[in-house]
């Protein structure tokens, strides 16, 4: 019987990345996937010979540069054409957020655009404090090591360097719900709906659930094309990126 050093259950993009990292480290890895084709949300489906549609994932907004390097992804898949976010309404023209999560906004008043940029800059700055923990192994509950304490200490120092007022604001917002944050900073229901959607996509929380803002922090810890909060469509669509993961 063939033996393996590691068995990864699930051939989605996370499972495939884990398998690739283990394999590069010299481990013999088996990936188990229930579907006949690996890729998970990145998996595309052919609906006619010569034509392929994307699966659940339509855009890329959290492709870690280290993962792209690990998988040796070509430039046309690791980056691509920046795509805007369009928020539709049946009463007014659409709000269009361009560049990295609304650096430029069309379809809203100047005052509202300024309010959104203030919120955007605040959230990106705060998400940067949490970002340092994403690639760390969670500490064991019974034996927190020196490196874990050092990571917490560096996060605390980064928070202190932002000043007392910003530090208090971060600690206040950290456990809040995204709906209250939207009401606090914004007046346009389209933009409120956008941040609520991004904060709760893929999680079992509603916009008024406590801690739902954490989902938006997570969204803004990622980057695309070198820009925090950006999003793009790779050449050939997301399905082409999924094939590269395999």
Model-identified regions with their sequence ranges:
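N-terminal glycine-rich phosphate/pyrophosphate-binding loop and immediately adjacent elements
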Residues: 2-144
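Active-site/ligand-binding neighborhood in enzyme catalytic cores
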Residues: 124-246
